[in-house]
């Protein structure tokens, strides 16, 4: 029996990145030997075991053979005669097909070290094309390691295109698509994930609402980058700098979906694109089964981001109504989330990357003023039932009006 550290732990250690999870491959053993040694079996379809002390995963070396459609249609073979090289060959990328023995020696049968050095994401073998989930995984790796200068090998991108055009991605379940997307949204450069999907044709298949934005012009005066698809990826990049939250990043990604519905004869104007985009947000989220909390913020951002851009022109009543509309009294975090997504929208434009966004500050200040109006004082003043809410709203409007007079500049 020989045990090797494999995959991501080896890769990230070589890149000088923190190692989170360690996975091991066991060569020359059987399930019974593992159980006799005190390991606990957890894999139903293939033999994976938990170490009795560390609870890290130890898998018997195995091969996989395509036996059906999609990413689940595989038959596994695990036996003592399966070599380490056999096991590593079934992995997706060469940089993930590295192993380390107990002496610290690196085993590299597929030139993963060379590809690490050259910052290349390259598939190990043609078997890559049998698993459509790998298209999303490679896009996610491209986003995860973009800051280190990684790029996808030309032949791998070509294979991803072939898989997409062959309809392989249609076998992916919504849950898996969202899981990979959510993971990509946590990376330093989530926009790269969507750019890669576009480069291989997968964006049109999985995110048609986003793909439809490319080639749609916006007024050059406000959008020097002109193309709404490019603007969308720029805003996502900016959102990633402003917030680590998936909610904020996803909402930013979806903020301009309504522009994809504008008839070409009305271009480059997009009046009413915010409310129009709400239905597309709902459509996308329903299809991918996006969690409700993430979906709800994306809907609100689509509907209200342009309103926040015009904050100095809003009257106090409209400002308080905005807080009502986003349910800020019960979910105060939404004020900050809306401020960040709106800022990402403004700064996600060519030449505006370092622009100030005072509207975000004013939104936060107005919220602090509105929420500081005490409910208790209204009740103690003798108001009852529905009168309490009406009086509370009236006092909040008055407080915001007073603040606006002193702190928020009047529009020209």
UniProtKB/Swiss-Prot annotation:
Comprises two domains: an N-terminal domain containing the nucleotidyltransferase activity and a C-terminal HD domain associated with both phosphodiesterase and phosphatase activities. It comes from Escherichia coli (strain SMS-3-5 / SECEC). HAMAP family: CCA_bact_type1, CCA_bact_type2. Its EC number is 2.7.7.72, 3.1.3.-, 3.1.4.-. InterPro entries: CCA_bact (IPR012006), HD/PDEase_dom (IPR003607), HD_domain (IPR006674), NT_sf (IPR043519), PolA_pol_head_dom (IPR002646), PolyA_RNA-bd (IPR032828), tRNA_CCA-adding_enzyme (IPR050124). Mg(2+) binds at residues 21, 23. PROSITE patterns: HD. The gene is cca. Its cofactor is Mg(2+); Ni(2+). CTP binds at residues 8, 11, 91, 137, 140. This is Multifunctional CCA protein.
